[in-house]
Amino acid sequence: MLFDDVPSVGPSEVSAKISDGWTLVDVRTDDEWAMGRIAGSRHIPMDQLVERLDELGDQVVCVCAVGARSARVAQYLNAQGREAVNLDGGIYAWAEAGLPLQT
């Protein structure tokens, strides 16, 4: 797979990362974001990421719908010197695990 080098975490690991001070960034579109999101996530659509990098901390959990866009973002952030991981399976895996979404 193209993103084998990108570290990933499962839905059950995200809360611990947030508790440890990691930023959770949701890179989905505005319409996707409006349908439901993880509480505490910061919405920065993928096409705005470069100009909004200063809104992110040094440790970032990236999320999108299924994990492909967020894997690209995590790969980019890691190349920029940040520590980034991808939520494997994205928001769908989160919801499938029975975890809550905000609307």
Task: Give the positions of each predicted feature.
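Rhodanese-like catalytic fold shared by cysteine-dependent sulfurtransferases
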Residues: 1-23, 29-60, 68-103
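Short, surface-exposed ligand- or partner-binding patches at beta-edge/loop junctions that are enriched
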Residues: 63
